[in-house]
């Protein structure tokens, strides 16, 4: 299974990706996480340091693939999760999609690409140009990380459009949304009404999620010394269980930009009209089962 994780810049994709990777490993799967961001910090909370990138390694070998060994580019992270950072071209030059392609090419050369039960691509920001949409070419599922805010959901809608476009020629489905660190989900629910898709999980506004990034640890590692965080890990285990069940997923039909702008801005400009939509805090919400949607 191959999963591509997208979302607005700064929304918590890497933190969420690392914890999902650990959750999948806890379920007995062999997991590889590939960071697809020039900052090469996707796997930081798994390894505790910034690992060398594929591009750096290839450059040091003068792009002689035969001189590269698995241990040159694949690093063991917490919980047995293997980690790779694709890296990227110099700022303002080159194409990130090319880098992702070179990464996959090298892993295939090393006979590593097909050795894993799950490969998770953690992709930068909400950039959905052809280059950084490249991981969707390899993915079975896409997950979109969001919060209950206007900007994150607007970005999610653009990513949904990319999934729909890629699904024309690839066996790709949107597994669903993950709400990250949000005390409410009214805007998320309003968006999902307009663009039907599953909501895999909504994580409450937990400060330790943010702190974990600063500490360079996953929530699972922090929970070893702070058992009070075990309940946070359950959110990620729930996401992992849903993914391992091989959901049908959806081919989303994005909301037109102007329509979405009106839909979401109405919640801010006319709060009284939406009083009935205001929900309980997410830590008191029990997610109900959803029938999968398939929209063509």
Curated annotation (Swiss-Prot):
Its cofactor is [4Fe-4S] cluster. [4Fe-4S] cluster binds at residues 95, 129. It comes from the Eukaryota. One of its GO terms (biological process) is photosynthesis, dark reaction. Pfam families: Fer4_NifH. GO terms for molecular function: 4 iron, 4 sulfur cluster binding; ATP binding; metal ion binding; oxidoreductase activity, acting on iron-sulfur proteins as donors; oxidoreductase activity, acting on the CH-CH group of donors, iron-sulfur protein as acceptor. Its main location: plastid. CDD domains: Bchl-like. Binds 1 [4Fe-4S] cluster per dimer. Belongs to the NifH/BchL/ChlL family. Component of the dark-operative protochlorophyllide reductase (DPOR) that uses Mg-ATP and reduced ferredoxin to reduce ring D of protochlorophyllide (Pchlide) to form chlorophyllide a (Chlide). This reaction is light-independent. The L component serves as a unique electron donor to the NB-component of the complex, and binds Mg-ATP. This is Light-independent protochlorophyllide reductase iron-sulfur ATP-binding protein. It comes from Chlorokybus atmophyticus.
